[in-house]
C-alpha cells in the first residue's frame, strides 16, 4: 500500500518569505492555511540559528518553524510537543542536540568553525592575503560596517559552522584563496558584502535533506516531499533538489533560472509572490482548506 504524501515547505527568508521590511505579513493567508493542515514550514537561510530563533518570537502560530541556518550547516527543531497530545513523541526522541536555545534543539558540528578559523588564519599569514573575518572585528566595528544594531550583531556573530570574511585584496588573490581552501575541504559563498567560508559538505539542499530524513524517521507512515522557495543563486541547489520548486523574482538582482524546467516562477516579489505561489500549490494538490 502506497504511503500518503505529506508536504514540507522549505523557504529562504530575505526577499522570499520576508519583504523589504523583513515582514511576512503578506504571506499570512498561506501561513494560516499551512498551520490548519499541519504542513511544516522550514526556514532555510544563511542567518545564524540565534538570529532565526529571535525572529520566531514574533511567530503567530502554534507550530513553530524548523530552522536550517548558515546555508545548511546548522539545524534547529522545536523541543516542545507540536500537537495537543503532550504524550506524543517529540523531536528530542529522534535526535541528539548539541545545544538548547530558547526552546529549540540545535544541531551542528562543534568542531567545524574552529577548523575554519584555524585554516584561514594560517593561510592569511602564510600567503599575506588581505581579509578580515567576523571574529577579527570588534562589535562596534561590525555595527558601523553592517548597519546592524548591537543586539543584531551579537546574534549574527553567534556562528557555529561558518565565518564571513570581508575581502580587502585583489581579485587575483581572491581566486587563489578560493582554490587553496578547496584543498582543505572548504568553499566560499560570495554575498553582497561578505564572503562566507564554510565546509564543502554543507549547502541548503543538504540541510533540507536532513530535515526530510528526520521527518521520515519520526513519521515513517508518510512519504515526505518538499516544496522549496527562494530568490537567489544561493538557493538554487535547494530548489534543484526539491520535489517542487518556486523561484521568487528579486527586485534588485533580477530573476534566476534553474537547470530544471519544471519549476514555477512567482508572479510577484518577496512575501506577496510567496503567498500566491504556495496557495496555488496547495490548491493544486488539494491540501488547502
Q: How does the language model describe each region?
A:
Residues 62-70, 151-153, 245-250:
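Short hydrophobic/aromatic-enriched beta-strand-loop microsegments
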Residues 49-53, 174, 205, 235-236:
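Short, well-ordered alpha-helical microsegments
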